[in-house]
Each structure stands twice: as C-alpha cells, then as structure tokens.
Curated annotation (Swiss-Prot):
Organism: Mycobacterium avium (strain 104)
EC number of this enzyme: 3.1.3.3
Protein's recorded name: Phosphoserine phosphatase
Keyword list, A-Z: Amino-acid biosynthesis, Hydrolase, Magnesium, Metal-binding, Serine biosynthesis
Binding positions (Mg(2+)): 187, 189, 343
Binding sites annotated in the UniProt record for substrate: 196, 232, 275-276, 320, 346
Limits of the ACT domain: 10-88
CDD domains for the chain: ACT_PSP_1, ACT_PSP_2, HAD_PSP
Cofactor: Mg(2+)
Reactions the enzyme catalyzes: O-phospho-L-serine + H2O = L-serine + phosphate; O-phospho-D-serine + H2O = D-serine + phosphate
Note accompanying the cofactor annotation: Binds 1 Mg(2+) ion per subunit.
Pfam entry (one): ACT_PSP_2
Pathway: Amino-acid biosynthesis; L-serine biosynthesis; L-serine from 3-phospho-D-glycerate: step 3/3
Length: 411
C-alpha cells in the first residue's frame, strides 16, 4: 500500500525569549508524528523568532488537532505563532555561494539599504544575515546565492557602495576552503605596528622629511621599492647601532593586534611577518608576539655604526611573495590556505599569491587587487573576514581572564 502524500508545514514562533520555548513546541509536535526538515532561530534584544519546517501527511496538516495543540501550547507561554501549509516538501538547497561582510562605525540604514539594493538588482538572494561584531566596529555577515556569471558585477557594485557609504564591504566565496586557512602573514609598518620604522630611524638622523617623501612615493607605486629603500637607508649612515634598540622599544602595535594574534594562535594558525623594514628592529617584537616566521631586510653595521646600506637579498614586492611561499612550504600549508595582510603597493604580489589577500587601510593600488579591503584602524577586524565573531573572541578571552574593551573615540 502506498503511503499518503506528504505536505510541509512552516511554524513560526515570535515573542519575548524564555527558556523552554523550543522544548514546548517539539513536545507538541512529537505527539503528531511529524518529520523535521529544518529549524532556524534568532534572538535580538531578547526577541525570539523561531522557524520550524516539518512534513506530515496532508490529513494531519489539514486537521484541526495539530493547529489547535501548537497554538494552545505556544500561547500558554505568552508567545505568538503562525502556521502555514504547503503542498510542496522542499529539498534542502545547495549552500550559499558567497558571503558578504559589511563593517562600519556606524552602519547606517542608508548604507545597508544600498547594499541590499545592489544585491537585489543582480538577482542575488540573501539566505542568511547575522551579526558578527559590535566592537570595535559593527559587523554583519550576509550569506547569499549569486547567479552564475554575476560574481564580478557583484564585487564591482559593492565596491562602489563601500566608497559612497563609507563602510567596508567584502565579498568572499562561501566554500569549504574559506574555513581552512592555516597560515597568516602580516606586513609590519602601518599594519602590525603604527607608523613607519624607517621614518622613526630617519628622525634620529634628522632626515625624516626626506625619508617620508620617498616612502610615500614608494607606497603609491611611483618608485621602485629597492631603489627607494636604498635611498632611505643611505640617510642613516653614521648613526650608532644603538638607535636600533631605541626604535624597537618605541614601536606601538596597531589597535587589536594582540587580540588578533592571540585568537589566531588559539585556532592553530601559523603566524608570520614579512617586512620591507629591518629584521633587528622587528625580531624582539616577533618574539614577544610568539610569531613563527619573520622575513625582513638587514641593516649593515660596521664597528657599531650604520653604514647606510643593506646586506643580503632585499625584501621588496617580489621578495614578500617569495617569503610567503617559503613560509607556506615550511609550514606544510597549501597556498590556497594562506592569508596575507598589508597596506602598500609593495604588498601587491604577496596578497595576490595568498589564498585570501586583505588590504588594511591601504593605498588604492593595493585595494584594486586585494580580495577584501578594511579601512578601520583595528587589526582585529581581520578576524571577522576569517569567520570569527566578536562573541567567540571574547568567550575564549574570558576563559583566560583577558576580556577588555577600550573606549573608542568617535571617528
């Protein structure tokens, strides 16, 4: 004998959240022999929305008992419920194709509305929206299904929204590889630390103006990095080598840097830095932060004095990408599972080589080639692009007694 055809029933519960709502609903449903297809729940400011999709024979869905029992049980606990029947029994769809992150301080309704309009105009369906952060920025994640061939248009449209609405909007493929990153490498100057180390050294020689002009031109991609490095280092000739330790002691981490590295270590990432700066200045910080890999330039020192030259291979644009590949090989990590974070034109090749390249408060030349761009001066925003939420960060910190929020001045 053929079993009677089945239909689907969507039950939506809304109201003030309280313990036991889900248990109450499923206790009733179990008495009617329904089969569970899907459950989704969200709670915002203690307001619950619970959706339960079930299938059952048509006579159960159409009869009065199921509706009566569900409504009576839910209203008894003070919540509202709606019940919708459909002849279709839906098949669970393929997962979303992309994820979109929107980060801002603040995210205005106008900004999010602009994102939603561009998404809709391209026929992109929003499958899920969730909050990922309330500090140091507001962060939202949208999982979406993008029609074939619309990927490029989506990225272009959302880049425009990002610029016009002053929010960060990043689009990533929603694939298994997104969850499998294992090695992350940071640039140092203006990324891991605030400011430029070469300018701090130049200040000791009274050449900060000259060096700053050369640095700016190099970071905009207007000068060959190797030549600009040699010109800048030449201004340091004659300085005592003790200035290296002085400058190393003056380095200030980018806000959120410790949180970022602490969290990444908990997740099992290998972490490194690749810098066009100088190894002797960076190494003490790298040791303090327990970094696994360091690549940087070497200042020549003769008789305790800087000669104004570098020795060994120069870590330039190509050298940074080479260092990333070497780190990945040493760590046994495929390049698809690497992340690179930087801010200047000399980071272009490194970000292009990485599985995920993130431009951090970057020059236009780098933003154009990066997979994602961040414009807020908090390094821990990188974690959100890796799928880590602020709640997860602080829950892990709480175990070690490290939860701390610093007041952020208005932008």
């Amino acid at each position: 004998m053929n079993s009677p055809p089945k239909v689907s029933v969507l039950i939506t519960v809304t109201g003030v959240d309280q313990p036991g709502v889900t248990a109450t609903l499923f206790e009733v449903l179990s008495g009617h022999g329904v089969e569970l297809l899907n459950v989704e729940q969200v709670v915002i400011r203690h307001r619950l929305t619970l959706g339960v999709l079930v299938c059952c024979p048509a006579d159960v869905a159409d009869g009065p008992a199921l509706r009566h029992d569900v409504e009576a049980a839910i209203r008894k606990v003070g919540l509202d419920v709606s019940i919708e029947r459909s002849d279709d029994v839906p098949i669970i769809r393929e997962p979303s194709t992309h994820t979109i992150f929107v980060l801002g301080r603040p995210i205005t309704a106008a900004a999010f509305g602009a994102v939603a309009r561009e998404v809709a105009a391209l026929g992109v369906n929003i499958d899920l929206i969730r909050g990922v952060s309330d500090y140091p920025v507001i962060g939202l994640e949208l999982r979406v299904s993008v029609p074939p061939g619309a990927d490029g248009a989506l990225r272009t449209a959302l880049n425009r929204v990002s610029s016009e609405e002053h929010v960060d909007v990043a689009v990533e493929d929603y694939t298994l590889e997104r969850r499998a990153k294992r090695l992350i490498v940071f640039d140092v100057d203006s990324t891991l630390v605030q400011g430029e180390v070469i300018e701090m050294l130049a200040a000791k020689a009274g050449a900060e103006g000259q060096v700053a002009a050369i640095t700016d031109a190099a970071m905009r991609g207007e000068l060959d990095f190797a030549q600009s490095l040699q010109q800048r280092v030449a201004t340091l000739a004659g300085l005592p080598a003790t200035v290296i330790d002085e400058v190393a002691g003056q380095l200030e981490l980018m806000p959120g840097a410790r949180t970022t590295l602490r969290t990444l270590r908990r997740l099992g990432y290998a972490c490194g830095v690749v810098s066009g700066g100088f190894r002797r200045i960076i190494e003490p910080l790298a040791e303090e932060l327990m970094l696994d890999y360091v690549a940087a330039n070497e200042l020549e020192i003769v008789d305790g004095t800087l000669t104004g030259r570098v020795v060994g291979p120069i870590i330039d644009r190509a050298g940074k990408a080479t260092a990333l590949r070497e780190f990945a090989q040493r760590a046994g990590v495929p390049m698809a599972q690497t992340v690179a974070v930087g801010d200047g034109a000399n980071d272009i090749d490194m970000l292009a080589a990485a599985g995920l390249g993130i431009a951090f408060n970057a020059k236009p030349a780098l933003r154009e080639v990066a997979d994602a761009s961040l414009s807020h001066p908090y390094l821990d925003t990188v974690l959100f692009l890796l799928g880590v939420t602020r709640g997860e960060i602080e829950a892990a910190d709480a175990i070690d007694g490290e939860v701390r929020r610093v007041e952020i001045p208005p932008e």
